């Protein structure tokens, strides 16, 4: 699926396809126990590292501020969380590694996933709410005999398509 054509592209990203689909594949017997356990371990490490960067403070330092300005972003005057720096568009998980002394040695894919989750943290809950609202709309049935051409404000082309497809609920 091309995520650019999906309504929920923040949730249906290619980087998290294993997290979304492997549990189903395992349940259906299409995935070995070894691969499934490997995926679970990967996301356990991601969650653990995300928790760490959300808690870890960095103190202001001349070297850090020079580095930040060199990367086109403002320096810090008070301490900040590692996650706050990762959220900046000019920076990322790997870029700030020299200033994160408690960082464990992890596979690059773990760091990439941590960065993506940190950067999308504000947007994903909103999209999950949107998905839940759409699910509720799917429970609202449409009258079978509704003539969409009688609805004022609806373009003729849209009304004709709706009359042709006859959606059964508001979610469709």
Regions found by a protein language model. Give the residues of each.
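Active-site helical microenvironments for divalent-metal-assisted chemistry
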Residues: 12-18
């Amino acid at each position: 699926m091309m995520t650019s054509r999906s309504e929920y592209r923040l949730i249906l990203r290619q980087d998290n396809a294993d997290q979304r689909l492997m549990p189903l594949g395992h349940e259906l017997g299409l995935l070995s126990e070894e691969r499934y356990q490997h995926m679970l371990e990967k996301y356990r490490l991601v969650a653990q590292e995300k928790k760490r960067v959300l808690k870890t403070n960095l103190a202001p330092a001349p070297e850090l501020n020079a580095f930040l300005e060199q990367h086109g972003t403002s320096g810090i005057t008070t301490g900040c969380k590692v996650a706050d720096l990762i959220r900046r568009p000019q920076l990322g998980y790997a870029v700030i590694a020299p200033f994160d002394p408690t960082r464990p040695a992890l596979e690059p894919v773990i760091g990439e996933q941590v960065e993506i989750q940190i950067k999308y943290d504000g947007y994903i809950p909103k999209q999950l709410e949107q998905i839940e609202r759409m699910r509720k709309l799917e429970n609202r049935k449409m009258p079978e005999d509704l003539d969409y051409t009688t609805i004022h404000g609806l373009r003729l082309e849209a009304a004709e398509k709706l009359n042709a497809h006859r959606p059964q609920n508001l979610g469709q």
